[in-house]
């Protein structure tokens, strides 16, 4: 049975709900993963689909977690976003279609040149030590 909007809101919290379902943006430098650099993967807070690896995370200084690439390009979808008079590329999770943030072409050139600027509220971190028990064992190879 599909979760209702209210059940989802209760499960993930108000901020995560507003970010993932209504394309809100958390305030810069307030997210729990902005200055967080432990080894593990980041999954969609709504669906649990694997999105990003700490191996691709870097400190961009933008105030949100920044990644050079998703774990797999098929895990995210890009969408044109012309809101607020800006032209940006919105990033969503493929399965749940959760709003994650935006991707820009000002990332580290030696790592592909992209900066995935992602809201902490859209993510859940799974430490390497918990990958097996949480069902993400196949991603341990990223940390060998």
From Swiss-Prot:
One of its GO terms (biological process) is protein repair. Residues 5-128 form the MsrB domain. It catalyses: L-methionyl-[protein] + [thioredoxin]-disulfide + H2O = L-methionyl-(R)-S-oxide-[protein] + [thioredoxin]-dithiol. It is an enzyme of class 1 (oxidoreductase). It comes from the Bacteria. Belongs to the MsrB Met sulfoxide reductase family. One of its GO terms (cellular component) is cytoplasm. This is Peptide methionine sulfoxide reductase MsrB. NCBIfam families: peptide-methionine (R)-S-oxide reductase MsrB. The gene is msrB. The active site is at residue 117. InterPro entries: Met_Sox_Rdtase_MsrB, Met_Sox_Rdtase_MsrB_dom, Mss4-like_sf. Its EC number is 1.8.4.12. The keyword Oxidoreductase applies. GO terms for molecular function: peptide-methionine (R)-S-oxide reductase activity. The keyword Oxidoreductase applies. Keywords: Oxidoreductase.
């Amino acid at each position: 049975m599909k979760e209702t909007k209210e059940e989802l809101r209760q499960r993930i919290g108000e901020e995560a709900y507003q970010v993932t379902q209504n394309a809100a943006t958390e305030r810069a430098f307030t997210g729990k993963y902005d200055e967080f650099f432990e080894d593990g993967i980041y999954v969609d807070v709504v669906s649990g689909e694997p999105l990003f690896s700490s191996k691709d995370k870097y400190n961009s200084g933008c105030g949100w977690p920044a990644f050079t690439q998703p774990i797999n390009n098929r895990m995210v979808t890009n969408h044109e976003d012309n809101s607020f008079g800006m032209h940006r590329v919105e990033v969503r999770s493929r399965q749940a279609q959760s709003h994650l943030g935006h991707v820009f072409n000002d990332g580290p050139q030696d790592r592909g040149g992209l900066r995935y600027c992602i809201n902490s509220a859209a993510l859940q971190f799974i430490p390497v030590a918990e990958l097996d028990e949480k069902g993400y064992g196949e991603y341990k190879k990223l940390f060998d």
